[in-house]
Amino acid sequence: MSDLSWIYTYGFLGTRLFELPSLLICLLLIVIVGYKFKVPSNYQVVLALHCMLPFVLNDVMFSTSYMGDQFRYWEGVNAIRSGELGWVEALTGGDNVFQASAMLALLPFPAPVSPISLGFYNTFLYIVLFFILYVKNIFTKVSIWFYLLFPSMALYTALSLRETLILFFMVLTVVYARESKILKSILFIIPLYLIKFQNFFILAPIVLMYFIFNVAKKGMGLAKAVTISLISLAGLLLAAPIAIPQINHFRAAMFVEDGGKAEEIMLISGAGEFVVEGLTSGVYFLSKPFLWEANGLLPLIQSFENLFVLAILFLITRKAWMKSPDNLAFWLLFMALSMSVYGLVVFNYGTAVRYRYPLVMIYVLFVCADCDIRTLFSNKQRPNKQCPNQELPNNSLFPKINQ
């Protein structure tokens, strides 16, 4: 692989000057698409501010090596763009770093000259996803501001990582499932299998249930949700002899990867412990790191963020329970499944935040959309039909993207 270190000879400011074309692409996307679909200027301003984040994260807020896998994606995209690694070879080779790099290499950007370059690639995906959700009328006032201001999302969508791709494919899989467009939903969940198979196995049964129970039109129903939960619990108990060794393997691997010693990890020894650990670790995974567990500036910031996010989740869930418990039940199943799966195997606080934010974002987006959550505090019931003077787009006035 060719030497990429030449960029460091240009210093801090020189490195960032090379990224100005990428910044311009992102800003032009906001201006052109925002103008076409008459997106309110306050949303466009926040998106434009997001475009500046790649400049002020790596080697400003923290060292690039703090999340060292950024170098691997940077090198992977460069290898593909330079022809040292074939695109098909990267996509089919089995290494999910190269598979994610192959997908990023398709984006209309200059070659990534520094580790911060892919932050603009991911910012581009973040902006594209925003406009798709906006034009498809997925957003409510609550979810649109959560999307724009969620700190973890702002952080990870501006770094040179695969997390934005994961979020992008997961959200669009659900979007097309809600529209009963099976082929498009499958099209977006397949790349997810390549770059993050855990999320694929979390999302696939959820999407399948969405189609089977016609959740978009009928909701899940509390009785169905309880029945599915009991069946799932029974299935876990029956599968315990097979599942426990695999879970222990991943628990140990993740613990060692995060700097622990294999002999210090507490392994799951029985079916009862498996179920209890899954339930309790799911709640802990959603909440950590707590303030007293934070060790360093970034974990401390993330612990304060957790308090805010948990409060928002509580308010959204409470309002959804009051308005549409049948629709809420489905997304509570999604949240319980996803948090429990990762809670069993993830120990590092930073890793937990990184893996958790796409799942939290999906919950907020689609609980607000399916339960029509437009405010967190008012008890007044609003009709589903939007008012003519509402900020968000009306389907009768705006064309839709990728329908």
Can you say where each PLM-predicted feature lies in the sequence?
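Transmembrane-helix motifs of polytopic, lipid-linked glycan transferases
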Residues: 28-33, 120-139, 311-315
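Transmembrane-helix signature of polytopic, membrane-embedded enzymes
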Residues: 39-41, 130-151
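Alpha-helical transmembrane segments and terminal signal-anchor/GPI-anchor hydrophobic tails
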Residues: 67-71, 192-193, 201-323
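Short hydrophobic/aromatic helix or loop-helix immediately within or flanking a transmembrane segment
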Residues: 68-113, 280-281, 285
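Loop-to-helix entry region of an early transmembrane alpha helix in multi-pass inner-membrane enzymes
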Residues: 110-128, 303
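Multi-pass, polyprenyl lipid-linked donor-dependent membrane glycosyltransferases
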Residues: 121-124, 145-149, 153-171, 195, ...
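Membrane-interface transmembrane helices that cradle and orient dolichyl/undecaprenyl
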Residues: 133-138, 171-184
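Membrane-interface helix-loop-helix junctions at transmembrane boundaries of multi-pass membrane enzymes
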Residues: 135-141, 179, 220, 314-334
